[in-house]
Amino acid sequence: MKKYTFHPQKKPNFGDWQAFIVSRLTIFPHMHYTPYRDLLLKLFPNYLKVRKLPLNGGMTCPNLDGTKGFSGCSYCNNRSFSPVFDQAKVSIQEQLDKFVPRLREKYPNAGILAYLQPYTNTHAPLEHLKGIIDPIIKHEEIAGLAIGTRPDCLEDEKIEYLAEQNKKKPIIVEIGLQTANDLTLAAINRRHTLAEFEDAVKRCQAAGLTVTTHVIVGLPGETMEDFKKTATVVRDLHLAAVKIHPLHIVAGTVMAQDFSAGEIKLLDFEEYCAAVAEMIKIIGTETAIERFSGESPSEMLLAPNWCGERDRIIAKVEELLSRK
């Protein structure tokens, strides 16, 4: 395997994180939110840029394998959002050997943040998790690790293990919430509650882990009040970052069937941007905004056709936030 030499670029010492945020908002008063790159700057101070490297740990989901159910969340098709979906049977070491050099060739000076993305990446016995995570942490080219998971798959022993790894390299635990409305969580077949989410977040934070989440705006039956409640939960839990994206309908899901039957009404572009702007007003600047939208491959996306227009969405949200 070819050896790649890279040179982390040292940035100025900004000192205290909160002071840095204040200074940033002073220099850039138009910024009504904290971009995700600022969180990465805090976690990886030796790099001007950090790039995510999606990896497939070969996991499944308690909502699919019978632990809690077999049908999965009604909106979810992992193939629609994970570029490494087809790597499930490839070992982590093989994936690292294959993908790290490619990313390093493209970004020779960037930090590499490994990202265990598809399914629920703590839904396995601890020893199995160690076999997945240890090689990632030990890899000299990997700066840190982000782990996508559910709140009901974070037992104390797993959190303790992740906390130990966090002493070696930064660990980001991305815990899916989707909405703070328990009735909606039940309706979309999440099979966990808001209380379980809050408990998992607090236990991870108490162990020193960086915790982020992702939420969906526009779930069936929800209104602006629901979106604001979800934003309030994100703010009050002092989460490090949040991904926000509109409900989009992808092939192969229960919601695709309901949408085709005319049973689901999606937010339009203006409604979505207005909701995101109101949520950001509540979330404030302590929590970074990692994503303003989400997208799926065109062959899988049924609606809406604008959800991949990231720049347009950000511009509209910023316009709304700038209004007095």
Describe each region flagged by the PLM.
Residues 21, 27-113:
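N-terminal [4Fe-4S]-dependent radical SAM core
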Residues 79-99, 103-126, 141-154, 170-196, ...:
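Core AdoMet radical
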Residues 104, 133-140, 162-170, 205-206:
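Acidic (Asp/Glu)-rich catalytic clusters
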Residues 126-133, 155-164, 227:
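Distinct, well-ordered alpha-helical segments
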Residues 28-51, 241, 248-324:
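Auxiliary Fe-S-binding modules of radical SAM enzymes
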Residues 195-254, 270-293:
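Conserved C-terminal portion of the radical SAM core fold
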